[in-house]
């Protein structure tokens, strides 16, 4: 998962918040070490096709929802790269937030998880990766 951590550390370089210990033990997600190169390749494949920075709130299908390939933010690169290896961060983040909402940053004044946007927010991804020791 080193490639994912490298991608995430780039995304979170300017993000900080306090993390709490998990209230409910996180679900184990198996990602084999030999997929690291494939995940990095999934990110590389977006070069030239993801052309516009667009942080707009978009209603997405769930699970497996995504903004149009030509648009997105930095977290969408990570989401798509992992999805290329059958790892759906939208579903994983949403399920963990549904069980452990208080463990996630409360920057957006929400009262419950939102599967349309939560997985696209870097502080939420940072929390998820930390909670799942990735």
Residue ranges and their predicted role:
Residues 35-40, 98-134:
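...with weaker cross-activation on analogous glycine-rich loops/strands in unrelated enzymes
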Residues 54-75, 88-112:
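Acidic helix-start/capping segments at beta-turn-to-alpha-helix junctions
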Residues 21-43:
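Short N-terminal segments immediately surrounding and downstream of signal-peptide cleavage
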Residues 4-13:
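Bacterial N-terminal signal peptides
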Residues 44, 48-51, 79-87, 94, ...:
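Sec-exported extracytoplasmic/periplasmic mature domains
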Residues 32-36, 40, 50-51, 64-75, ...:
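Solvent-exposed, acidic/flexible segments
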Residues 14-19:
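N-terminal Sec signal peptide cleavage junction
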């Amino acid at each position: 998962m080193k490639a994912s951590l490298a991608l995430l550390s780039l995304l979170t370089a300017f993000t900080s918040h306090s993390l709490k210990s998990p209230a409910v033990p996180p679900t184990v997600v198996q990602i084999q070490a030999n997929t690291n190169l494939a995940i990095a390749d999934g990110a590389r494949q977006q070069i030239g096709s993801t052309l516009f920075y667009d942080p707009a709130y978009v209603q997405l299908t769930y699970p497996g929802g995504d903004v149009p390939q030509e648009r997105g933010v930095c977290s969408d690169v990570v989401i798509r790269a992992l999805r290329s290896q059958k790892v759906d961060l939208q579903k994983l983040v949403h399920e963990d937030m549904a069980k452990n909402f208080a463990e996630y940053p409360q920057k957006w004044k929400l009262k419950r998880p939102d599967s349309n946007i939560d997985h696209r927010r870097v502080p939420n991804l940072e929390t998820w990766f930390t909670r799942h020791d990735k």
